[in-house]
Amino acid sequence: MSEHTPRPAVSAEGLRKSYRDQVVLDGVDLEIPAGTIFSLLGPNGAGKTTMVKILSTLIRADGGRARVFGHDLAAEPDAVRAAIGVTGQYSAVDGLLTGHENLMLMARLHRLRGAAARRRAAELLDRFDLAGAAKKPAAAYSGGMRRRLDLAMTLVGSPRLIFLDEPTTGLDPRSRRDMWQIIRDLVADGVTVFLTTQYLEEADRLADRIAVLDRGAIVAEGTAAELKRRIPGGHVLLRFAEARALESAARELGGETDPESLALKVPGGGGIASLRGLLDRLDTASIAPEELSVHTPALDDVFLALTGNRGADDHARKANR
C-alpha cells in the first residue's frame, strides 16, 4: 500500500469458522474502504452474524486474518475494540433506566466522568432527537426511539467503524427512514458502517458496496447497480392507445404483447443508447406509444438468483413488506 492510498476500514483474507462439522465461513475475503457503507446480505444461517462477531472481536476465526484500521484482530484486539461500536439486532437499552441514565452508564464504561460524561450524553440526546424524553424510562419509548437510543449508546465512544446488525428490524416505515438518514449522517461525518439487513431495499438505498454471502462464501460483490446488471430480466414496457399500434410495434420490435392492457414488453437493459435506438425505430415506423417505462431487475431478484436455498424466499418476503 502506498503512502497516498487510504487505509481500508476492514480487510480480511480467508476467514474461516466452523462449529463442529458445520462450516459457517469458508475462506471469506473482504476489503471495506473507510467512510463508506458496506452491506452484507445473505439468507438466515449464511454466516452474517458470525462475520460481525469475528470482526468485532466477540469470537475468534478458525483461520485467515483480518485487520480493522490496520490493527490485527488476533494480535491487537484492544486497539480494534477502541475503534469500533456494535449495535446488535436486539436492543441493549436498559428499559428500567431513563435515556439519560443509559447514556451515562455507557459513558462510565468508556471512562468518561463528571462534566465530560454529561456533555457527551446531552450531545447525543440532542443529535438523536431524544432530549425531550431524556428523563423518561426507556421502557416507555417507541420502537424507533429505542433504536435511536441504542445507536446513541454505541456512539458514546466515538467509534470510527460501526457494525449495525439488522438495525431497523421491527420498525415502522417512517422510523426505518429516520434511521436511514441517521446512518447517512454518520457516514458524512467520516464513520464507516458495516450493515447487515433483512431488508433488500435498505441495502439498495444505503450501501456503497454490497456483498452477498451464501453457504459461508461471498458469491457476489459490487454496487447495487453492478449486481443488478448481472441478472437478466431488464425490459422496456410500452403502452399504446390502440390495438393497431400495438401490433405494428410488435412487428417492428418483437417482444411480448399483452393485448388486454395494450402493452408491449421489449427485452433490454434500458441504457441510453439502446433506448434511443428503440425510439428511433418507432419514429421511423411512425408508431407513437402513449407511455414508456424502463424496468430493471431489483435487488431481491439478484438475491434470489444468487442464493439458491430455502432462506431466500423468506428474505424476499421481508424485503417486500
Regions from the PLM with identified roles:
Residues 129-130, 256, 288-293:
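A short linear hydrophobic-aromatic micro-motif
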